[in-house]
Amino acid sequence: SIKDVVELLNSEQHNSKNILMTTGSKNIPEYVYITDYKERVYLRLLPNPEMLQSAIEAGIMPSHLIGMQGPFSQELNEAVIRQFNIGVLVTKESGSNGGYEEKVSATENTGIDCIVIKRPVEENGVSLPELIKYLKTKGL
């Protein structure tokens, strides 16, 4: 969860590193709970005026907003990491459409940490006792 990520970013391991948030605009209000967020948090988001305004209103510095439309290559991710002296990249487990692999490869090539917000587990199916009960009702 984003709250777990904020806690991790505030831990001794990460609390002095610049952070590149590539998780979208939905969680912007949570970023203010990151220690020294005005200096450390860089936010890459769509160049949508409403999203940019909400980030500014939440206290993210305009100089720390990177308004870009993806998808982004590994090389572009690496360039952003170097340009802003990023030490931690935060991403969602988004698959190929979200450029997940390119972000992870960029963190590996630049030697920085990558924090991945996993997708919620979708629980489809039935438990073993439910399956046994169902099979018994079918005479199997």
Task: Report residues per predicted region.
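Short glycine-rich anion-binding loops that position phosphate/pyrophosphate groups of nucleotides
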Residues: 25-27, 94-96, 120
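Anionic-ligand binding region
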Residues: 18-65
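Glycine/small-residue-rich loop that forms an oxyanion/phosphate-binding "nest" at active or ligand-binding sites
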Residues: 1-9
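A short helix->loop->beta-strand "cap" motif at the edges of active sites that frequently abuts
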Residues: 39, 109-113
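A C-terminal functional module that forms or caps the active site or interfaces directly
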Residues: 56-64, 68-79, 83-84, 88, ...
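Binuclear metal-ion centers of metallo-dependent hydrolases, dominated by the metallo-beta-lactamase
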Residues: 124-140
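Short, flexible loop segments at boundaries between secondary-structure elements
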Residues: 48-51, 113-125
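Structural motif corresponding to alpha-helix initiation and N-cap regions
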Residues: 2, 74-75, 125
